[in-house]
């Protein structure tokens, strides 16, 4: 094992002594924790060596006690945990409930005690139902309130917000509901007054308004997502991967697999399942990402981030290959769009079909 047990001098043992004053009135017996974790910034100490060895496994990641059952790859940090786990394979239940009239059996003694204290140990059940002919007792007050629903048919936890008469069966559900009234205020920026009605709306707001923009180190264009930036950076490469359409009779090529998939779905398969729900629009798209990009058109706030310089009209050749020529060359270009297309198609290498869908080739842009 990577870590060894640290030496335990009398001073170290004294330092890890648990006293009655530290534990309060209900103090445990005084215990010397002689086995101390040697990992930096840990400070865990134990009174038995096997407990320390099991703890060290948390640092090293080791599980020295593997399950030997065929097909089971689980491992454990202590023999006790392995023994308890092995009972799930054998199905043995050697521990029987001690209460009269109860013959339930359990795989471990701890599970048997838990059952006994929950259902048979009346001494620790301090919350008793006083409805006629009931008398059931519970350890926790919220358990009693949940039980009383069977008598009153009224959920026990009522929303305290004025004008809201909703009720819930559990305090956790009431707490979650109260967020509807309080909301989720944005804490990313002191000047932001957004309050989300739900956690989902809050996360959506953070992603759209407070996400760090990814900046291209060549042209300084900004993008909301890093994958958009990666796609954009390919336009600056001299040698680029070209995706050729594998469909018979189609010589289209694209610089991203996304554009090729979009082309196949919308043009060849005529599938455009993503419809813009903005009133009066109704445009359809083959890819969800295309719809998300289009939605910026209808959102003035998003359009602010999409400001960019006007781009000159692209030739047919540049649209087919995805290549955008420099501005200086674009101005001085005297070759017609048809001639550019012919020269690029002639020099386009024949691709190899991959799984009948995508074809990749290298094309050097000069």
UniProtKB/Swiss-Prot annotation:
SMART domains reported in the protein's UniProt record: ZnF_C2H2
Main location: nucleus
This protein's record includes keyword Zinc: yes
Post-translational modification, as annotated: The N-terminus is blocked.
Modified residues (Phosphoserine): 38, 336
Biased composition (Basic and acidic residues): 299-310
Gene Ontology MF terms in the entry: DNA binding; RNA binding; zinc ion binding
Record-linked Pfam families: TFIIIA_zf-C2H2 (PF22110), zf-C2H2 (PF00096)
InterPro entries named in the record: TFIIIA_Zfn-C2H2, Zinc_finger_trans_reg, Znf_C2H2_sf, Znf_C2H2_type
Consequence the record notes for mutating residue 350 to E/A: No effect on phosphorylation by CK2
Expression across tissues: Synthesized in oocytes and, in much lower levels, in somatic cells.
Cellular component, GO annotation: nucleus
Region Disordered: start-end pairs: 299-366
Outcome reported for the amino acid change (mutating residue 38 to E/A): Abolishes phosphorylation by CK2
UniProt-annotated location(s): Nucleus
Keywords: DNA-binding, Metal-binding, Nucleus, Phosphoprotein, Repeat, Ribosome biogenesis, RNA-binding, Transcription, Transcription regulation, Zinc, Zinc-finger
Zinc finger (C2H2-type): 35-59, 65-89, 95-120, 127-151, 157-181, 184-210, 214-236, 243-268, 274-298
GO biological process, alphabetically ordered: ribosomal large subunit biogenesis
Function text: Involved in ribosomal large subunit biogenesis. Acts both as a positive transcription factor for 5S RNA genes, and as a specific RNA binding protein that complexes with 5S RNA in oocytes to form the 7S ribonucleoprotein storage particle. May play an essential role in the developmental change in 5S RNA gene expression. Interacts with the internal control region (ICR) of approximately 50 bases within the 5S RNA genes, is required for correct transcription of these genes by RNA polymerase III. Also binds the transcribed 5S RNA's.
Name of this chain's protein: Transcription factor IIIA
Gene that this polypeptide is encoded by: gtf3a
